[in-house]
């Protein structure tokens, strides 16, 4: 199974909606950052002699670095990989004080989209230093399976919503034959849509609602690639409002564009063309091109 879609969706949220990571950081590391805290995105590519290491996210809040990896499977080598990633991040951001360096490791965690009873709550490795001292390197493991939709909304963990569909992944074959199971899924996603709409559109975040809903549908389409009825059902439940919001956005952009054109015509004393610009689409497009609008 090609798992790059999960990385793509996760990185899209980190890069374009980094503030969604703040509640997750608060949840995992018991911090209390406000939603509008300043976030600096650090480099995800870390050059080493034997090749390049690419991490999913590295964020700076205040003076603290946070590293979150999104993992679609329960990889038993993840603890070693995290040490490697974190060491690369720490070295790249090392501070030099005279001839002495200060290397601070990031606060890290792994988001497991799929997990099992064997997936630990912490990924751990014993690191033995040359002086014989042992330090336990411990990374919190976040498991999607532990979060219901109610928990997600209560804790504002909206970043987890695109991956919520993973809990239904093993039931998809049963849903082909059992319409009741399918209806349970669709009802749950209708609740998600309503809660998300209330959470975001009423607070002036319609664009975030649209973008997040698109990512929810994108993951669902991938998980249910061969189940057309399920794909269509989720698309109908989640996608309808997105199209409506997109329509409203385009309408607003169109009105703003026309208003700009009319102002330009007034400035140029081309009064006779204002009516034509408002009623004749071809003339309007011609004037848009003329003014470069």
Q: Where are each of the predicted segments found?
A:
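Accessory alpha/beta interaction modules
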Residues: 1-159, 281-285, 293
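Short, charged alpha-helical interaction segments and adjacent helix-coil junctions
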Residues: 60-72, 172-293
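Coupling/switch segment of ABC-type P-loop NTPase heads
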Residues: 153-181
